[in-house]
Regions:
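Conserved SAM/AdoMet-binding glycine-rich loop
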Residues: 76-79, 86, 91, 189-314
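Conserved, mostly hydrophobic/aromatic
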Residues: 160, 180, 197, 234, ...
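Proteins enriched for Cys/Gly/acidic motifs involved in redox and nucleic-acid/cofactor modification
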Residues: 1-205, 245, 256, 260, ...
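Glycine-/small-residue-rich active-site loops that bind phosphorylated ligands and cofactors
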Residues: 14, 50-53, 83, 239, ...
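Generic beta-strand/beta-sheet core signal
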Residues: 8, 80, 198-200, 235-237, ...
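Radical SAM enzyme [4Fe-4S]-AdoMet core and its adjacent flexible, acidic
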Residues: 12, 206-224, 228, 274-275, ...
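Contiguous mid-protein beta-loop-alpha structural module that forms a pocket-lining wall or clamp
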Residues: 311-318, 325-328
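Terminal RNA-binding accessory module
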Residues: 346-448
Length: 448
């Protein structure tokens, strides 16, 4: 009898890669993947615990999935990921429907958990937080067939005071260049055209392999040699190790997207110090000036935290003025989340939730206006775009949805082509001219 598997992957793209590896292991064991949880014999929930809202979403998703033990075919519920790693005792005690917990380094033990379920036992597998997958692992790609995430490192050594990730993901550890290149070659052979390189701290790639010196530029040089890969994008570029050599290869290598995602979190020096960030405002400004002065335009994305403990109105205003001055192309804003087990979470000068929300909306409003201005400046320009899906438009027309080369999957806006007929299909990369720019999206036409 065929065994069916349902899954939900929450949180970041790094978590999604872990999910895809677990799916690959289970498929090799004879499971078929279904989108209908009601029909699934086994359900896996890969959880996130980065902020409070992510915890709430994870708990609610687990409880919803548990209902399929009564209303569906589910015989086993496996909970994996960061929430499992951090709250294993509480989850096992308070949600008895959970059959197995798998920690962040134990994804390769998913079959051990399944075997325990088949024998009527509950299991909690948390060892090996030093683990990291490699090219030999089976993996079921859940993203569109032409774009895939590649995790080049795991864990983090930065110790930001607001973040629990080092405790639940372990110390920073890199895959070898050979392993990553082999995986990218395999993805290319399956039809992938865009790879998105990810890690907790992508610019630190290789420091554990090369006596404290990053190897990211060396990795990029090897990946650009892989035939079939047309776009290489990087996310989570921590500013400390962002070198001139890295900027140079981004600017000059055609396959590399002219796109830089630098999570700055704040710019006030006192706040940065309290966050245990290594870079000062002056360091940040020097780096951004280099990027802005590059001979080729490089899209700038960042992420910011508002409402960090003790953040004053003046410090928040400094942040707002900085954002207005730099004019990031894209920005993600998060309200500070008080996390158990973190230094910042133990502070007594927490900012009231209503103040954090007000600051969030203020900064998002500022950025929306900047993004709209930036996108309007694109009107009349020509860029490459990747088609992601076709939708039915008005009056029986076909609407193509996709991304410019300057837009990352999942986190940025979209590009739309109206009335494209049968000229394009998902996965196509083609030249387009931007006709209209809005706060997050653009409308374009095909360059014939």
């Amino acid at each position: 009898m065929t065994k069916s598997l349902g899954y939900i992957s929450l949180g970041c793209a790094k978590n999604l890669v872990d999910t895809e590896v677990m799916l690959g292991l289970l498929k090799d064991d004879g499971y078929t993947i279904t989108d209908n949880l009601h029909e699934a014999d086994l359900i896996i929930i890969n959880t996130c615990t980065f902020i409070e809202k992510a915890k709430e979403e994870s708990i609610n998703t687990i409880l919803e999935a548990a209902q399929y033990k009564e209303t569906g075919r589910c015989k086993g519920l496996i909970v994996a990921g960061c929430l499992s790693q951090q709250y294993q005792d509480e989850l096992f005690t308070e949600i008895p429907e959970i059959d197995a917990l798998i920690g962040t380094g134990a994804w390769d033990q998913v079959m051990v958990a399944v075997d325990a379920i088949e024998h009527g036992n509950r299991s909690c597998i948390m060892e090996n937080i030093t683990n990291i997958y490699d090219e030999r692992m089976p993996r079921i790609q859940t993203t569109p067939r032409y774009s895939a995430y590649v995790k080049i490192a795991e864990g983090c050594n930065n110790g930001c005071t607001f973040c629990i990730i080092p405790k639940v993901r372990g110390a920073f550890r890199s895959r070898s260049i050979e392993s990553i290149k082999a995986e990218v070659e395999r993805l290319s052979a399956s039809g992938v055209k865009e790879i998105v390189l990810i890690a907790q701290d992508t610019t630190s790639y290789g420091i554990d392999l090369n006596n404290g010196k990053p190897l990211l530029t060396e990795l990029l040089k090897e990946l650009t040699k892989v035939e079939g890969i047309e776009w290489i994008r990087m996310l989570y570029l921590y500013p400390t190790f962002f070198s001139d050599e890295l900027l140079d290869i981004i600017v000059n290598e055609p396959k590399l997207c002219k796109y830089v995602d630098i999570p700055l979190q704040h710019v006030n020096n006192d706040i940065l110090k309290q966050m245990n960030r290594r870079d000062s405002r002056e360091d940040i400004e020097r780096l951004l000036k280099k990027i802005r002065n590059a001979p080729t335009h490089v899209t700038l994305r960042t992420s910011i935290i508002v409402g960090f403990p003790g953040e004053t109105d003046e410090q928040f205003q400094e942040l707002c003025e900085f954002v207005k001055d730099i004019k990031f192309d894209n920005m993600g804003v998060f309200t500070y989340s008080q996390e158990e087990g973190t230094i910042a979470g133990a502070r007594e000068d927490q900012i009231p939730e209503e103040v954090k929300e007000e600051r969030y909306h203020t900064l998002m409003s500022i950025q929306a206006a900047i993004s709209e201005e930036n996108n309007r400046d694109l009107e009349g320009t020509i860029d490459y775009a990747m088609i992601e899906e076709l939708e039915e438009g008005d009056n029986n027309t076909v609407l193509a949805k996709g991304r410019l080369k300057s837009q990352a999957p999942d986190v940025d806006g979209n590009m739309y082509i109206e009335d494209c007929g049968d000229k394009v299909k998902p996965g196509d990369i083609l030249q387009v001219q931007v006709e209209q720019g809005f706060a997050y999206d653009v409308v374009a036409t095909i360059v014939e």
